[in-house]
């Protein structure tokens, strides 16, 4: 029997021993398949090639066995485990490898039972996206067992890792699964029969004979992805699926039990990417989404997100990514030098580096002040055009041509560098050639090169030239350099902002720049950038305390107006880089949102709840004033510097209490 469609998800069902035929350690894979004709989802099984005992041992390493006191050894053991899992799914024969290319049109050959896939062939280049499906949305609340916080005082690993090590657990929980307008509520006290009845509203259950055993296929009726909020505790997430697995397979006792093994960032002592995968149950994607309560991504965005993985979920590491071929050969000879996404970060000739006292993390603060005009050239679609010209259609996420989606583009780029070396080098080489040519052209125009941000924003300065002359020259330079170095006919979208005579950049954990003064985004960094720009612009020849006081009061008015606005204050932090106050749940094992507290520590701050009363508003004011002080020190004599310090202290004393008034 032949069937046309596409694979939407692939995982392991279990590893079993075929005693009758004396075949041991046989992996059974399960594929969530979208049938083209009926547009319905089906689950098929694939019989894999037998594993050797060593590989099986690496896959079956338990969480308890990974909890080593040597944290680096623990991290290495987890890396080894996920490498074995990824290698099993990606390299267990050509059939399984073909089915791991998601949304690619396939023709599959089924066995007589209509259950097992025997062969699979790619039958088209255009992606077959399941746009008529909807995601399952998980929401969960729970209570945790008490834990002595003295176990969490050290800072050698994440709080999440320490909590797991000392037996942190969920006492009780309640959760819901929502599909479209159907919301199903569950409690940890539900019986197995009740759970199965509820689940059958959005999943189909089918008991089938396979390889001399009975298997249970749990197939989502109209979904291939489950979404949960970034701020959902990962321990609650694990508890939900362990509960569902136990209850369902407790009712269907006669079947071969499906695996249900969680892989997430909390298993690494120093944290990992915000990505989750279950080996076995459930057979669908689990995606973490920012601010899910207010904004549910559409199916197109979910497809793009999955395609940007280049294979399996990111948490399964580089071995879980496809080796993507280059779609065209470059006519320019590529050098053999190592490439890096950080290559164009700073021109150190003009941007100084130092550690400032207001920095709470490990990074240096990079500072630049200039009396020259500053130009910010943005090419929002240059990465998309480069990828479109080099990546085969079957692997290219369908990026929206009307949206920048720069974060998704950068993630996709970073994932290419692990296994798709030739492709990654080709893209970076073209970008390098273009940027080098553009830099030379700017130098010939008398412009100084400062910074490249996120591979598509270029910061430059220029003295004494008319803006109406410079901008057309910059656009011409971009177009000519692009055409000569990339051989791509479509030109990138050109955007340019000019900042007159007040150029500055502060690049640290946060980013402040005179270029942000034109932004409409509501965030403290934008307000601070506008304040600093105004002060620098109007104090070229002398320090006028009357003017900077007025600007400071304007900034304070905006700060006060936003003092309850969570999104205005929160920032994202990498795990284990900063000292974090105790919080409930496992929430700091991947990139998380937080605000600064009064005692200099971070406080976890979710997007969807009220702003914590522990926030230290004075920190954000102090950061802004310290940057202004650095500018004063670089521009004026000791007398003005002393006067500024007095003024700074007076402003803090007179205004800081206003942010705490109700």
From Swiss-Prot:
Disulfide bonds: none
A Gene Ontology cellular-component term: host cell nucleus
Keyword Ribosomal protein on entry: no
Recorded superkingdom: Viruses
Compartmental location: Host nucleus
GO biological process: DNA replication; viral genome replication
Keywords: DNA replication, Host nucleus
Purpose: Component of the helicase/primase complex. Unwinds the DNA at the replication forks and generates single-stranded DNA for both leading and lagging strand synthesis. The primase synthesizes short RNA primers on the lagging strand that the polymerase presumably elongates using dNTPs. The primase-associated factor has no known catalytic activity in the complex and may serve to facilitate the formation of the replisome by directly interacting with the origin-binding protein and the polymerase.
Family recorded in the similarity comment: Belongs to the herpesviridae HEPA family.
Quaternary context: Associates with the primase and the helicase to form the helicase-primase complex. Interacts with the origin-binding protein. Interacts with the polymerase catalytic subunit.
The protein's name in its UniProt record: DNA helicase/primase complex-associated protein
């Amino acid at each position: 029997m032949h069937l046309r469609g596409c694979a939407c998800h692939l995982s392991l069902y279990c590893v079993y021993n075929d005693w009758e035929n004396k075949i041991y350690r046989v992996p059974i894979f399960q594929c969530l398949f979208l049938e083209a004709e009926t547009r319905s989802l089906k689950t098929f099984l694939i019989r894999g090639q037998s594993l050797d005992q060593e590989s099986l041992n690496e896959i079956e390493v338990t969480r308890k066995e990974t909890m080593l006191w040597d944290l680096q050894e623990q991290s290495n053991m987890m890396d080894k485990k996920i490498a074995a899992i990824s290698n099993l799914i990606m390299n267990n024969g050509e059939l399984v490898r073909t089915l791991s290319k998601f949304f690619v049109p396939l023709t599959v050959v089924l066995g007589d039972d209509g259950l097992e896939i025997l062969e699979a062939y790619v039958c088209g280049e255009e992606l077959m996206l399941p746009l008529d499906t909807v995601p399952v949305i998980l929401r969960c609340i729970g209570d945790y067992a008490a834990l002595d916080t003295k176990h969490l005082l050290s800072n050698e690993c994440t709080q999440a890792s320490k909590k797991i090590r000392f037996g942190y657990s969920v006492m009780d929980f309640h959760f819901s699964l929502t599909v479209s307008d159907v919301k199903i509520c569950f409690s940890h006290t539900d019986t197995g029969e009740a759970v199965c009845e509820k689940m059958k509203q959005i999943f189909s259950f089918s008991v089938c004979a396979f390889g001399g055993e009975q298997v249970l296929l749990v197939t989502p009726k109209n979904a291939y992805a489950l979404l949960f909020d970034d701020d959902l505790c990962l321990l609650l997430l694990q508890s939900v699926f362990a509960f569902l697995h136990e209850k369902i397979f407790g009712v269907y006792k006669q079947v071969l039990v499906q695996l249900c093994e969680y892989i997430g960032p909390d298993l690494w002592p120093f944290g990992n990417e915000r990505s989750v995968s279950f080996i076995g149950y459930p057979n669908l994607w689990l995606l973490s989404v920012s601010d899910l309560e207010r904004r549910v991504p559409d199916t197109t965005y979910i497809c793009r997100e999955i395609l940007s993985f280049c294979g399996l979920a990111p948490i399964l590491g580089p071995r879980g990514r496809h080796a993507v071929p280059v779609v065209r050969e470059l006519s320019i000879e590529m050098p053999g030098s190592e490439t890096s996404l950080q290559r164009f970060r700073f021109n150190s000739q003009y941007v100084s580096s130092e550690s400032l006292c207001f920095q709470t993390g490990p990074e240096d603060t990079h500072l630049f002040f200039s009396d020259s005009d500053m130009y910010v050239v943005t090419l929002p679609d240059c990465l998309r055009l480069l990828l479109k010209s080099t990546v085969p259609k079957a692997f290219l996420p369908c990026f929206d041509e009307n949206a920048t989606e720069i974060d998704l583009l950068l993630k996709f780029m970073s994932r290419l560098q692990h296994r798709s070396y030739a492709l990654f080098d080709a893209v970076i080489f073209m970008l390098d050639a273009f940027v080098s040519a553009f830099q030379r052209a700017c130098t010939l125009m008398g412009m100084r090169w400062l910074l490249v941000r996120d591979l598509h924003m270029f910061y430059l300065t220029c003295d004494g030239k008319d803006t109406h002359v410079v901008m057309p020259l910059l656009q011409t330079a971009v177009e000519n350099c692009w055409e000569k170095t990339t051989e791509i006919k479509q030109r990138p979208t050109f955007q340019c902002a000019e900042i007159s005579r007040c150029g500055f950049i502060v690049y640290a954990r946060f980013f402040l720049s005179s270029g942000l003064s034109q932004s409409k985004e509501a965030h403290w960094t934008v307000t601070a950038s506008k304040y600093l720009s105004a002060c620098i612009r109007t104090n070229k020849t002398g320090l006028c305390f009357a003017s900077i006081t007025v600007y400071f009061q304007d900034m304070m008015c905006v700060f006060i107006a936003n003092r309850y606005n969570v999104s205005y204050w929160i920032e994202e932090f990498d795990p284990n880089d900063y000292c974090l106050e105790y919080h409930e749940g496992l929430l700091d094992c991947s990139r998380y949102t937080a605000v600064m507290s009064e005692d200099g520590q971070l406080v976890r701050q979710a997007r969807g709840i009220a702003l914590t009363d522990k926030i230290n508003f004075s920190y954000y004011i102090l950061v802004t004033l310290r940057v202004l002080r650095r500018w004063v020190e670089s521009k004026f004599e000791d007398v003005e510097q002393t006067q500024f310090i007095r003024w700074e202290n007076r402003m803090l004393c007179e205004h800081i209490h206003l942010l705490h008034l109700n």
